[in-house]
């Protein structure tokens, strides 16, 4: 074999090694990644689906539109339960935090300077958004006392107080936070457990918005119009359901 032939064979073998079958199937001429390389997906927020709504509505014996009406009022304009993956929307309540700290004998005055963010209004300008500031307040408050901070915060798309963790069917505060941080379906399940355990499922079943709002939102519900807003939201979702059903029926006839 002459020198030229030997060189060509060597080059061909090298090309075959560099361009593997895995590259060919991927349609690329870049060197293939090692076989044991695992591509990891970015963390994602697991949103509620129609099937999620239907499943929990069936468990509670209520209409899907009734649950969606509560979401419209409690979950803010975006109707979502998360600020970022693993970070549920929260509302840190300083008054509630103080109450639970007092019950545990925690002297919060010791932390007024070292943990000043906890005791001031959320600074949206400094942290980029009000929710970012709230997340930082909660994080700092948890460094004072974890359970007290969780109890002094309202969580997720249904804004359930952390002090209600047992009524949500959780065995511990840690389980409550873990489930709240997992998905919107988990938040919906916790909401279902909560209203069932305090007897509010009946009010939701009967569309008694005043009774529901009085217990869920407190005595100032009427002044804030929670009951009338829920009623309007329910009617809106029923109209959407009807329009969707009529559209599906028309498609079937075509």
Roles of regions detected by a PLM:
Residues 28-254:
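Catalytic glycan-binding domains that act on GlcNAc-containing polysaccharides
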Residues 1-9:
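Bacterial N-terminal signal peptides that target proteins for export
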Residues 20-30:
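Signal peptide processing junction and immediate N-terminal pro/mature segment
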């Amino acid at each position: 074999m002459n020198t030229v032939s030997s060189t060509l064979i060597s080059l061909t073998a090298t090309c075959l090694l560099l361009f593997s079958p895995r590259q060919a199937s991927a349609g690329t001429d870049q060197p293939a990644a090692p076989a044991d390389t695992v591509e990891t997906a970015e963390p994602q927020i697991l949103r509620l689906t129609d099937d999620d709504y239907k499943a929990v509505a069936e468990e509670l014996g209520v209409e899907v539109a009734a649950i969606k009406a509560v979401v419209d009022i409690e979950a803010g304009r975006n109707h979502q339960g998360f600020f970022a993956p693993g970070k549920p929307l929260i509302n840190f309540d300083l008054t509630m935090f103080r109450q639970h700290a007092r019950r545990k004998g925690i002297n919060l005055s010791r932390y007024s300077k070292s943990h000043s963010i906890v005791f001031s209004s959320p600074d949206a300008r400094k942290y980029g958004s009000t929710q970012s500031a709230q997340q930082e307040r909660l994080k700092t408050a948890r460094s004072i006392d974890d359970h007290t901070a969780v109890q002094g915060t309202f969580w997720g798309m249904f804004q359930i107080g952390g002090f209600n963790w047992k009524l949500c069917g959780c065995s511990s505060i840690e389980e409550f936070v873990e489930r709240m941080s997992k998905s919107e379906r988990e938040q919906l399940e916790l909401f279902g457990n909560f209203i069932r355990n305090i007897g509010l499922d009946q009010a939701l079943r009967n569309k008694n918005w005043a009774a529901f709002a009085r217990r869920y939102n407190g005595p100032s519900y009427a002044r804030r119009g929670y009951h009338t807003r829920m009623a309007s939201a329910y009617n809106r979702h029923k109209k959407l359901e009807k329009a969707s059903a009529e559209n599906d029926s028309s498609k079937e006839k075509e």
